Amino acid sequence: MPNWGGGKKCGVCQKTVYFAEEVQCEGNSFHKSCFLCMVCKKNLDSTTVAVHGEEIYCKSCYGKKYGPKGYGYGQGAGTLSTDKGESLGIKHEEAPGHRPTTNPNASKFAQKIGGSERCPRCSQAVYAAEKVIGAGKSWHKSCFRCAKCGKGLESTTLADKDGEIYCKGCYAKNFGPKGFGFGQGAGALVHSE
């Protein structure tokens, strides 16, 4: 069919795409309303689109349809592994830990000085403008970091042990289960003799 209007054709509906409604992706033009995942129909943008030939997908559906398959894939980011790569010649360096909590008396009364609480990491007064609450204590925003790797934390992404706070990854590495069979997920094969 001839293109009399001079506009580009949408990669999904094949109708003319005018400039005001155009989204471009890998040399193709789409209507904004047609720039959807072919499977789940979610709206896409330049950061969420994955292209396969002439088809467009969200990254999640693309991975399910065209990603690697088989044993060891699809376990997700939440699995634990104790392999540090020594068999491949990778040398593991421990990150320097942050200074542990120095406050031996963690009672609420002892932490209150002049109407403000003390930060368990630096023992300085914590005022409302810089206060973050985690593990039942008040911290400075700048002190609210993993005691091992220094990663900034949120009250929902921390784990605490012995008065110190850790990111979930460091907590799992240092205090989680260890040994063969842990962290493989529900569908893992179990080696038994």
Swiss-Prot record:
Annotated crosslink Glycyl lysine isopeptide (Lys-Gly) (interchain with G-Cter in SUMO2) location: K91
MF GO annotations: metal ion binding
Any single biological process term in GO: actin cytoskeleton organization
Keywords recorded for this protein, A-Z: Acetylation, Isopeptide bond, LIM domain, Metal-binding, Nucleus, Phosphoprotein, Repeat, Ubl conjugation, Zinc
GO cellular component labels: actin cytoskeleton; nucleoplasm
Classification lineage: Eukaryota, Metazoa, Chordata, Craniata, Vertebrata
Phosphoserine modified-residue sites: S81, S192
Protein name, entry field: Cysteine and glycine-rich protein 1
Annotated compartments: Nucleus
Name of the gene: Csrp1
Subunit structure: Interacts with ASCC1; ASCC2 and TRIP4.
Modification type N6-acetyllysine: residues: K84, K112, K131, K137, K161
Biological function: Could play a role in neuronal development.
Species in which this protein is naturally found: Mus musculus (Mouse)
Nuclear localization signal (motif): residue ranges: 64-69
InterPro entries according to UniProt: Znf_LIM
Keyword Phosphoprotein applies: yes
Residue ranges of domain LIM zinc-binding in the record: 10-61, 119-170
